[in-house]
Amino acid sequence: MLTRRMQCLRGAGVFRTVAALPLLAQRPNFYRPLTCSALRRNNDHSYRHESRKDKEMQDLKESRKMREQEALDDAAFRNTFEFAVEKTRDSDGKSPEPEVEIDVDREAQTPWDPVGSQSRHETRQEHRERFDDIKKTLPSSVHESQPQMYKWFGEKMDQIQAGALTAGQTLNEVTGYKAIEKLKLSIEKLEDEVLEARAEVREAKRMYSDAISERSNSQREVNELLQRKHNWTPADLERFTELYRNDHANEHSVNDAKKRLGECEHHVEDLTLQLSKQILTRYHEEQIWSDKIRRASTWGTWILMGFNVVLFIVVQLGLEPWKRRRLVGSFEDKVKESLQEWEARNEARRLEEATMAATATQAITELQRRIESPHVSKADVVEAEAEINSIKTNLATWFKEREEEEKEEIAKEAHELAVIAEDPDMTDVHHKPHPPQPVDTERVVRPHLVENFEHHVADPVHHPTLPITSTPVLEEDAPPPRIHPLVQMSPDSPDDGTKTFTATRDGYDVHPLVVRPTTPPHFMLQVWGAAKLSVESATNKTVAVVRSTFQTAEQRPFESTIVASLGGLCGGLVTFLYLR
């Protein structure tokens, strides 16, 4: 019976638990002998209690483990954050703050409490906000906040770089250098294989030498045992048997090592031969490629030289003549326009001077008629002569002022012509880009009627009653008569008063004009017309000379052009010889 009950107790697991004893001790009044069913119920209750306690312990361990992991994460985050803050302050030139030491074990062993977890959560949130503020100043954030134009420019530059790389690859494919690059990579790979094969050969030699040395040692030991065969012990017999049994294996190992060594050496020879062939092939292909590029470079040089020669011919035979023609034509137009303006002004001045001279002549004629009348008194004669002298003086003063004005205009027009000759494209010459040069205005003058005024008034043909000697010559030292700015008096004038005027233009003397002292005003008008014809003829001759010069320059290039042509041809020849 006792044995059976012990079996029941052992089967119920009473000996495995101790938790049910205090419960039984707390209820002494209800104590009764235990039966198998009661013990089974108590054991079930204790088992459930144990399971609940085990579950609580497991939950406690898991919560403690989670707290430890959170403490480790917080410590790592704080370390990272402090490091980032220190680096940022160092980069800004500020002094770093003192580091805070964190005891991870103490953080992990701290009992869990909701208040502490809330404070740590707030601290973690604050650290994350500060880290977000610092993250805004990082290069990646700055790049994201850059303007769209800057990003677009960066993308375009990347595309251009990629396009340049693609163009280089395309050029290599077109020229055939890509296959050479593949061959180069194959050679490099084969060199690595040769190095590995040589290492295998060295390893095979070592194994072969080890096998030979092991077999030699075994044979030496066998020979030693055979020499003392009559003194063998059981151990010597066993050793001899073992050595004799291993001799066959040693022989096989030596043969295998020798065979493997031969295979490795043969493999190295094959790889070396293949490497040599590929190196020779690469050298041959690179030579062919370099010859192709050199040939293309030669043709490109010839094409460039031909383009330069064609461009030189076009410039010298097309552009330069057109430029010279344009310069000459522009200068001709400016000169003709200036001459036309000059002639128009001279015509107006001539008419004005003729009108003034005619008016003065009429007035003086009336005064002379009054003097010649028989009923005039001596006082009236003196008054009339004084009035005549006054008219002559005023007329001379007026002509002198007009002459000064004309000299100034001549100097101005000469300066304009000089500017036009220097730069025919200059249209606004009144700004005077260059300082005016002194002009010889004494040689270039206009007609002056004051010198011949006495002869006009005292003409013996129209006034036979008035002797020539009775009229004084007011301007004996006046310059010789001048009809046109381009008309000057011949220095070989006779002493009888006859003057010869010649229209001069660029060294050409045309239409000599002979003027006598008694030339009437109406003949002076004919002289004016002849002078105009002389100037026009001189202008036409000047234009003819300019055109002849232009044609000569067009047919015969300048020496500098010839030198430049020879220099270009010599340079091209030297370049071609150098490339060849």
From Swiss-Prot:
Coiled coil (UniProt feature): 177-275, 377-423
Basic and acidic residues composition-biased segments: 86-108, 119-134
Main location (coarse class): mitochondrion
Annotated transmembrane regions: 299-319, 558-578
Lineage of source species: Eukaryota, Fungi, Dikarya, Ascomycota, Saccharomycotina
Region entry Disordered, spans: 45-68, 86-134
Name the record gives this protein: Sensitive to high expression protein 9 homolog, mitochondrial
Family: Belongs to the SHE9 family.
One Pfam family hit: She9_MDM33
